[in-house]
């Protein structure tokens, strides 16, 4: 008993610990109460402004009681759903699936047959555990890889397994990615079934065909939409559910799934790219093109737009327009409404004007059809004339907002002509020059420039000319590029010359300064940039690892701004190069005046600058020696170019150009320069073969052909020459040569060795006559 008795010191220590724990509990409770009060205060402040609709927090958390005070009619039915918990995988199961994921990622299988057997076993093991697997942090990647490898029958069985739980899955951090992958991979099947090209896969032995396998993919998508229908208002701004909703909208509309614009709409930049060996074989060509979709999908889009906005008024939509997660979804809804239902709406409007008696009722129907646009800008375009109206206030509040301006860009791009004319006349037109100066408002203003008529564009250019120096100082090169391109499209030669004159004056009234300033060639090159991008001494993988270690983990804001300005400046140079006349001449003069070190910096620094040189080589020359001067600046650095990520593309472009121009000033590189390049490449053949970029250049230039059969290489290199030049360079017979030479000689020509003094003794003062030689 004495051993178990605590000492006085221990009792005092335990008492202190107990008091400390009590204080911590009280502090936590007090903090929770304050947090709850703060959330309630924020909700009360936003509730009247947002008409009882408040988007969920940005961190993805969702409080089931956060909307309890809002009326049921305004917040939509069953918004406060209870998320399901599907349980956790056992340790043995988790280890098995994790090992399977590693094997699929490494593709470490002795043969394709063993890989197929392994996949079949994984599918069998996964049966009945799909929900646990999809919501598992460590195994959801395996589910995505299996979806990429699944056939149509297996995808339908996954729809069956996920059915009834989609709302919990699409709002889950990990399962939402699996749902998106399933939706996107199943979209081409709808088109195949619609066109009759789909063939049912044979059922494996011992497996029964379920109702989902018998159903069409169209029905499975519609059943999924029915399940999500009650929660559309919540999914608009949910951190994970909004991505799944965007994916469904893109699928229903039939838009291409593999386009860059579609991918950026569906996923964030931080999204992990998951793939697996064999996924490309299962990929459908329909993903990269516009797909035919059934009429039920079009009706489903219309219903989604109506249901999503039915629970909100105009004020709630404005709150959603500035929400980081809800804004992209709202953009897509607005774009689909204007592009898919806009033309039908205009036709109905014309028919409605015929009947005066039913005008009011039909006007209400029209407003219901354009619910989203009508709620954002009511009574447009007439309302834009008064700055106090709801429509004008909405546009003015979105112009300078970094998130809301994106929705405004979509509205400007796709809105009907009447509404755009009102926007241009009353809001953007009078202050276009000040909007183009602003770093946020310039993007909606650029969208306006893309739709202006020739007269309005000339007026905008006239207002913008005094601001050219300000555009250059602030780096608004995208604005200058748009002005040049639109004037070129509208055939505004005078406006183009005025813009070029203003741009040149901003750079010291000298064309030679344009390219160095826009491409930042005047700045001192750091020691790291001066080193050639070669991997001569170390392997390619080691060089890449060393490069990654040298690069900072997080890019500073200054570096981001510099890269941003370099990108837009290079795009402006490339745009000017394609505009015939003075702009192209100015850029070619500036490129020809560059020093060899500056040309090499352009060739190896970035993709944007190297693409300028490629485009310059493919552009007709204003001066005959332009292409020759440009290539001669690169000749001393052929090996550095061949092992450079960006410079290798320039070498590959040079060999595709003809040696003799088909027309005067057409793109061409003299043949002796090509021979100089291939001879330098041959000196470094061994080093080139050690790198992927070097092998690519050697293969493109047909280096092996040069080494073993040089006359064949010469014939191949001259295949790009125009036909007349190749015929002229071909060897001819002796008789044909003599005949051509005789035709070229002037009449009365007596030959190269004819001596008139000797002819005097033979003929005297008489004319020289040719004697006939008898047989």
Swiss-Prot record:
InterPro entries tied to this protein: ARM-like, ARM-type_fold, NOP9, Pumilio_RNA-bd_rpt
GO biological process per UniProt: endonucleolytic cleavage in 5'-ETS of tricistronic rRNA transcript (SSU-rRNA, 5.8S rRNA, LSU-rRNA); endonucleolytic cleavage in ITS1 to separate SSU-rRNA from 5.8S rRNA and LSU-rRNA from tricistronic rRNA transcript (SSU-rRNA, 5.8S rRNA, LSU-rRNA); endonucleolytic cleavage to generate mature 5'-end of SSU-rRNA from (SSU-rRNA, 5.8S rRNA, LSU-rRNA); ribosomal small subunit export from nucleus
Pumilio repeats: 125-160, 161-196, 227-267, 390-425, 633-679
Keywords: Nucleus, Repeat, Ribosome biogenesis, rRNA processing
GO MF assignments: RNA binding
Regions of compositional bias (Basic and acidic residues) in chain numbering: 11-41, 345-366, 732-746, 766-775
Gene3D superfamilies: Leucine-rich Repeat Variant (1.25.10.10)
Basic residues bias (residue ranges): 1-10
Any one annotated GO CC term: 90S preribosome
Keyword Transcription regulation: no
Chain positions covered by the region annotation Disordered: 1-79, 345-367, 525-557, 720-775
Short name of one Pfam family: PUF_NOP9
The keyword Cell cycle belongs to this UniProt entry's keyword annotation: no
PANTHER family given in the database record: NUCLEOLAR PROTEIN 9
Function: RNA-binding nucleolar protein required for pre-rRNA processing. Involved in production of 18S rRNA and assembly of small ribosomal subunit.
Family: Belongs to the NOP9 family.
Identification of the protein by name: Nucleolar protein 9
């Amino acid at each position: 008993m004495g051993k178990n008795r605590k000492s006085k010191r221990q009792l005092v220590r335990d008492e202190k610990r107990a008091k400390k724990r009590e204080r911590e509990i009280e502090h936590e409770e007090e903090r929770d109460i304050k947090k709850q009060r703060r959330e309630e205060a924020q909700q009360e402040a936003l509730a009247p402004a947002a008409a009882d609709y408040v988007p969920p927090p940005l961190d993805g958390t969702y409080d089931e009681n956060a909307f309890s005070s809002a009326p049921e009619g305004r917040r939509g039915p069953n918004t406060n759903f209870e998320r399901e918990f599907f349980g956790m995988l056992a340790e043995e199961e988790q280890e098995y699936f994790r090992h399977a994921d590693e094997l699929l990622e490494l593709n470490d299988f002795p043969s394709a047959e063993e890989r197929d057997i392994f996949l079949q076993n994984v599918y069998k093991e996964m049966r009945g555990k799909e929900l646990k697997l999809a919501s598992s942090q460590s195994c959801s990647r395996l589910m995505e890889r299996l979806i990429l490898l699944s056939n149509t029958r297996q995808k339908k069985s996954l729809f069956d397994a996920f059915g009834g739980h989609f709302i919990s899955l699409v709002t889950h951090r990990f399962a939402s990615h699996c749902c998106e992958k399933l939706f996107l991979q199943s979209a081409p099947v709808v088109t195949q079934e619609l066109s009759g090209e789909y063939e049912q896969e044979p059922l494996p032995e011992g497996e029964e065909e379920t109702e989902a396998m018998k159903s069409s993919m169209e029905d499975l998508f519609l059943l999924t939409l029915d399940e999500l229908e009650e929660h559309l208002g919540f999914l608009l701004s949910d951190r994970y559910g909004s991505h799944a909703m965007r994916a469904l909208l893109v699928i229903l509309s039939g838009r291409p799934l593999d386009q860059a614009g579609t991918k950026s709409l569906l996923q964030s930049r931080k999204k992990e790219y998951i793939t697996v060996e064999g996924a490309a074989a299962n990929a459908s060509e329909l993903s990269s093109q516009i797909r035919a979709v059934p009429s039920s999908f079009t009706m489903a889009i219309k219903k989604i737009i109506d249901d999503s906005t039915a629970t909100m008024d105009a004020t709630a939509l404005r709150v959603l327009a500035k929400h980081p997660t809800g804004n992209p979804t709202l953009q897509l809804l607005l774009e689909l409404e204007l592009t898919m239902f806009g033309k039908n709406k205009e036709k109905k409007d014309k028919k409605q004007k015929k009947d005066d008696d039913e005008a009011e009722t039909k006007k209400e129907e029209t407003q219901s059809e354009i619910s989203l646009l009508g709620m954002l800008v009511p009574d447009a375009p007439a309302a834009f004339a008064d700055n106090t109206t709801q429509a004008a206030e909405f546009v003015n509040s979105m112009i300078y907002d970094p998130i809301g301006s994106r929705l405004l860009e979509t509205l400007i791009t796709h809105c009907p002509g009447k509404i755009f004319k009102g926007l241009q006349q009353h809001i953007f037109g009078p202050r276009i020059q000040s909007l183009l100066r602003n770093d946020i408002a310039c993007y909606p203003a650029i969208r306006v420039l893309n739709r202006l008529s020739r007269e309005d564009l000339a007026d905008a250019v006239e207002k913008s000319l005094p601001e050219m120096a300000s555009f250059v100082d602030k780096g608004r090169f995208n604005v200058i590029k748009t002005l040049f391109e639109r004037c070129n499209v509208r055939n505004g030669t005078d406006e183009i010359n005025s813009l070029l004159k203003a741009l040149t004056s901003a750079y010291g009234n000298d064309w030679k300064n344009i390219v160095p300033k826009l491409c930042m060639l005047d700045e001192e090159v750091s020691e790291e940039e001066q080193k050639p991008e070669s991997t001569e001494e170390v392997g390619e993988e080691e060089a890449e690892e060393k490069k990654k270690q040298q690069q900072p983990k997080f890019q500073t804001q200054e570096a981001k701004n510099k890269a941003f300005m370099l990108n837009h400046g290079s795009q402006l140079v490339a745009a000017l190069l394609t505009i015939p006349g003075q702009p192209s001449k100015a850029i070619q003069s500036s490129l020809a005046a560059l020093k060899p070190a500056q040309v090499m910096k352009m060739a190896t620094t970035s993709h944007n600058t190297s693409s300028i040189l490629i485009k310059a080589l493919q552009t007709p020359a204003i001066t005959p020696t332009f292409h020759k001067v440009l290539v001669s600046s690169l000749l001393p650095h052929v090996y550095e170019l061949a092992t450079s990520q960006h410079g290798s593309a320039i070498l590959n472009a040079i060999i595709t150009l003809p040696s003799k121009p088909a027309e005067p000033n057409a793109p061409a590189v003299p043949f002796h320069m090509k021979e100089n390049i291939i001879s330098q490449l041959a000196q470094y053949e061994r080093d080139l073969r050690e790198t992927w970029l070097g092998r690519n250049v050697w293969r493109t230039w047909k280096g092996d052909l040069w080494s073993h059969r040089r006359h064949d290489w010469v014939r191949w290199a001259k295949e790009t020459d125009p036909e007349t030049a190749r015929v002229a360079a071909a060897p001819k017979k002796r008789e044909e040569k003599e005949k051509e030479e005789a035709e070229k000689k002037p009449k009365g020509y007596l030959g190269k060795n004819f001596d008139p003094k000797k002819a005097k003794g033979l003929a005297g003062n008489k004319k020289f006559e040719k004697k006939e030689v008898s047989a």
